[in-house]
Amino acid sequence: MAVAENVGVKVDSSNNQNIDNNTTSLVETKPSCSDDQTPKSKSSVLTNELIQRTSEVNLKSEISHLNPMAKEFVPSFLAQTHHSEFWGNRFWFTNHFPKQTIFLIGQFATMRRNFGKGRPWITKKTNLVQNEDMIKRTVYVSDIDNQVTEEQLASLFLSCGQVVDCRMCGDYKSILRFAFIEFTDAEGARSALRKSGTMFGSHPIRVFMSKTAIAPVNPSFLPQSKDELEKCGKTVYCTNIDKEVTKMELENFFKTVCGEVHHLRLLGDFYHQTRIAFVEFKLAESAISALNCSGVVLGELPIRVSPSKTPVRLHHSDLN
């Protein structure tokens, strides 16, 4: 914003005193010249002119530090170009007048005062837009039979559109569960609403437009190498395991029915009435066979088996 350069500027009287002293000394020490035609009666006029000029110079020097019309600083990587205000298809703000600003994600677009340093200026807004788009493509399915797997539920909705993700959730105290299903487009989600009331398993499901998007899987849980990716193809995720079933009993069951087990990790806590397990087989064919074991009763509860999204990562306790 352009402002009058002299508005609000104060010059200390001590500076004026210094100016007077310096100017007087300059006049007094001026060497005499034989060609000097200036009448001595005009010496006071000359002194006043020098004082005025010196004051103006110092005043302009003071104001230049605060002048919004001062010359714009140009980084060295921009100064090498012919036009410092335009570089790499980007326009930048200068102090002369505002120009169109085009900030590209991840490139010279960090927030001011280093808040959120290293992140794009528009990342938050972009994430909100992407999240809203995901919500429009997602449906919420309730009253799902607890024997139904994610794969079976996703297969039911394939006629509505391409399924991107299916996330099954539920309380261990309830015989029914719920799920979120994401499609590639909003049209698939709208078509899925027609499935509401369909008998699936032992209970009719209900389908609504979701108010939230499916939370992404923690990247640290996903395969981190080609070897772990291959292990996922041989691994199944088993849930609803009776707490009375031991690790040895579970391993013997899968070994007898499906094939040799390479690794098995059984997990549980005091808060849940059931446990979960990750079972890695020697062969991928054994893992495929294990999917057919979903619904088999071990102890007093039917287990649920689905393909694992993560490999088995053993702890020291699992090696004992």
Curated annotation (Swiss-Prot):
It comes from the Eukaryota. Contains a PAM2-like motif, which seems to be involved in the binding to the PABC/CTC domain of PAB proteins. InterPro entries: CID8-like_RRM1 (IPR034823), CID8-like_RRM2 (IPR034825), Nucleotide-bd_a/b_plait_sf (IPR012677), PAM2_motif (IPR009818), RBD_domain_sf (IPR035979), RRM_dom (IPR000504). Residues 12-44 have a biased composition (Polar residues). GO terms for molecular function: RNA binding. Residues 137-212, 234-310 form the RRM domain. A motif (PAM2-like) lies at residues 65-75. This is Polyadenylate-binding protein-interacting protein 13. Residues 1-44 are annotated as: Disordered. The gene is CID13. Keywords: Repeat, RNA-binding.
